[in-house]
C-alpha cells in the first residue's frame, strides 16, 4: 500500500492527474483534477489510497491527509465505493457532511450522486460520531487558471460527469453558467454547490 507520492505533475484530465516519480507516470483519480492546475510541471505531494481489483490497480489521490481520512471513512460504509466517495469529497463541504451525518439529515445526504435513502441511512448508522471535528477544507480552492471561459466550462462539465452526475442535471448547470468566464475549478466548485441545493 502507498501512503503518498512525491513527484512532478505532468498531466491533468477530467478524471485523473498523472504524477511522474522515478521515471514512472502514475494515474491518480482525484476529486477535482483542475484544482491542481497551478501545479503542472511542479513537484507535488499527493496522499494516496490504493484499490486493488481483479482487472485493475487504482490510485485515489488527495491534497491533504484530512481529505484522505474523509474518503476512507466514506468507503467503510456499505454501498459506497471509491468513485461515489470521491464525488462526495469533491463537494468540499466537510462541515455540512459531518453535520448531516451527526444529525441524521437523510435528505441532505441523498443530494450526493448515487446516494439513495438506504445508503444515506447506512452513512448515519456507520459514521455518526466518527468525525471528532470537521475536517479542514480539502484544498480544491487552490488552483487558478486564465484559459477561455467556454473551454473551462466544457472541462468542468466533463469532470462532473466523471464524478457520476447525470447529463440532464448538467445541462441546467451549463445553461446557468453560459456566458460567464471562470476557471474549470471555479465552475466545478460553484456547480457542486448548486447541485447540492437541488
From Swiss-Prot:
Tell me any Pfam family this protein matches.
HHH_5
* Region described as Domain III: spans on this chain: 148-198
Give the UniProt entry's GO cellular component terms.
cytoplasm; Holliday junction helicase complex; Holliday junction resolvase complex
List GO molecular-function terms, semicolon-separated: ATP binding; four-way junction DNA binding; four-way junction helicase activity
Question: Where does it mainly reside?
Answer: cytoplasm
List locations, semicolon-separated: Cytoplasm
Q: Region Flexible linker: list its residue ranges.
A: 143-147
Q: Which domain of life is it from?
A: Bacteria
Name the segments for region: Domain II: 64-142
Q: Name one GO biological process term.
A: DNA repair
Q: What keywords are annotated for this sequence in UniProt?
A: Cytoplasm, DNA damage, DNA recombination, DNA repair, DNA-binding
Tell me its family.
Answer: Belongs to the RuvA family.
Instruction: Tell me, in a sentence or two, what this protein's role is.
Output: The RuvA-RuvB-RuvC complex processes Holliday junction (HJ) DNA during genetic recombination and DNA repair, while the RuvA-RuvB complex plays an important role in the rescue of blocked DNA replication forks via replication fork reversal (RFR). RuvA specifically binds to HJ cruciform DNA, conferring on it an open structure. The RuvB hexamer acts as an ATP-dependent pump, pulling dsDNA into and through the RuvAB complex. HJ branch migration allows RuvC to scan DNA until it finds its consensus sequence, where it cleaves and resolves the cruciform DNA.
Q: What information about domains appears in the record's comments?
A: Has three domains with a flexible linker between the domains II and III and assumes an 'L' shape. Domain III is highly mobile and contacts RuvB.
- What protein am I looking at? Holliday junction branch migration complex subunit RuvA
Q: Per the UniProt entry, what species is this protein from, by scientific name?
A: Streptococcus pyogenes serotype M1
Amino acid at each position: 500500500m502507498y501512503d503518498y507520492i512525491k513527484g512532478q505533475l505532468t498531466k491533468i484530465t477530467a478524471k485523473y492527474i498523472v504524477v511522474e516519480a522515478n521515471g514512472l507516470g502514475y494515474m491518480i483519480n482525484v476529486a477535482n483534477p483542475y484544482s491542481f492546475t497551478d501545479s503542472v510541471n511542479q513537484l507535488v505531494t499527493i496522499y494516496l489510497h490504493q484499490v486493488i481489483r481483479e482487472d485493475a490497480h487504482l490510485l485515489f489521490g488527495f491534497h491533504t491527509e484530512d481529505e484522505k481520512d474523509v474518503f476512507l471513512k466514506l468507503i467503510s460504509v456499505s454501498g459506497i465505493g471509491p468513485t461515489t466517495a470521491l464525488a462526495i469529497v469533491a463537494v468540499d463541504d466537510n462541515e455540512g457532511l459531518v453535520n448531516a451525518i451527526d444529525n441524521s439529515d437523510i435528505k441532505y445526504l441523498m443530494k450526493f450522486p448515487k446516494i439513495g435513502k438506504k445508503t444515506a441511512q447506512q452513512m448515519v448508522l456507520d459514521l455518526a460520531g466518527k468525525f471528532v471535528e470537521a475536517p479542514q477544507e480539502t484544498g480544491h480552492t487552490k488552483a487558478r487558471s486564465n484559459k477561455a471561459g467556454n473551454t473551462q466550462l466544457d472541462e468542468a462539465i466533463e469532470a462532473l460527469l466523471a464524478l457520476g452526475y447525470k447529463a440532464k442535471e448538467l445541462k441546467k448547470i451549463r445553461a446557468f453558467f453560459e456566458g460567464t468566464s471562470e476557471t474549470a475549478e471555479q465552475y466545478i466548485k460553484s456547480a457542486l454547490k448548486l447541485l447540492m441545493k437541488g
